[in-house]
Amino acid sequence: MRGGATEPGPMERVRALCLALPEAFELETWDHPTFRVGGGRGKIFCTSAADGSTLTVKAEPAEREALLAQGDPFYVPPYVGGKGWVGVRADHRRTEWEEIAELIATSYCLIAPKRLARSVTSPPSLDG
């Protein structure tokens, strides 16, 4: 980046992607950020380590199997891994943020109320 500006870290990127989705909000739970949609405390569509180094998202069964077959950076997360969620390590230089944006959007659409899910026509972008 120019002018001495630093590139955003993983947590800033995860936060930006999640909060770009309609009516999404952040709530700290279990000492780390959770991203939610819906009324009240909402339903979780993404969780992240406090530093953004890992995140978990809900995936369609076939997509989840394909991701897990690739191995690193994908893994079965504790607690929710058996319920259709997949973990992603997002703390290395080769992190593909476009793919993470797609995974976050898919998770959001699986969790969000139908009226909100229908409004997502493309993954969120880090380009503002």
Predicted regions located by residue number:
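Charge-dense, helix-prone N-terminal extensions
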Residues: 1-128
